[in-house]
Amino acid sequence: MINQTYPNIEYFVIDGASSDNTVSIASSYLEKFNAISGRSRKIISEPDKGMYDALNKGARLAHGEIVGQINADDYYEPDAVQTMAELYERENYALAWGSINVITKNGNMIKHAKRGLLWTTSHWCHPAAFASRKILLEYPYPLINSHDDFDFATHVYLDGKKIMPIDKVISNFTFGGMSTQKSFREAKKRLDEIYGIYKKYGMSKFYYLHRLLFETVKYILT
């Protein structure tokens, strides 16, 4: 975040009262970050209900018009905030996301942001997503499971709000989180969680078949 080209950034580090070195590492950059004109950074460490509860908290604390939300192991491209801020000024989007550079032990690959003919997670890139603060407050993450981000995006999409995927790398994602674990149990869990979102919003069972195929291919190739 220190190297972002956009001048005015309010940055919150939301930590769930962890016992590791998260707070001390974040604190070591605090003075340098706050010394940059137009920048402010705050660190909050207190018990929460997980990642999406922390993201909801960040949206409530923010003062800007748009909010980007990224996890500790991931990082933005230097022009990420500027790209998404300028896009918002032109388009006044509710939700926008870019492509991500996926970092793996075997090299990097680009996951391209698209809308696609079907509304699926295949082209949804949460680490590269920015939303208007108003939308994040109106549609908070429901705190149901690890796919709360897709639940949020689906709700916004089906309510007819303006969404804008752009095929430009916005962030770098470290492969190896909850959504990448290889086991039949984890694949089945992901399938059930995402189908639960489709069902919740009255979407066709065809989406379940599409996701089943996606998880099968993912299980074989990873």
Language-model features, listed with the residues they occupy:
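Conserved short acidic donor-positioning loop in nucleotide-sugar-dependent glycosyltransferases
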Residues: 1, 16-17, 49-50, 72
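Acidic donor-binding segment of Leloir-type glycosyltransferases
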Residues: 2-44
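Acidic donor-diphosphate engagement hotspot in glycosyltransferases and nucleotidyltransferases
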Residues: 22, 55, 76-83, 107, ...
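Glycine-rich, basic loop-to-helix element that forms the pyrophosphate-binding segment
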Residues: 37, 44-62
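Hydrophobic/aromatic residue at the end of a short beta strand that borders the catalytic acidic motif
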Residues: 51, 70, 75-80, 102, ...
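Conserved donor NDP-sugar-binding/catalytic core segment of glycosyltransferases
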Residues: 75, 79-110
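Conserved nucleotide-sugar donor-binding catalytic segment
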Residues: 114-189, 193
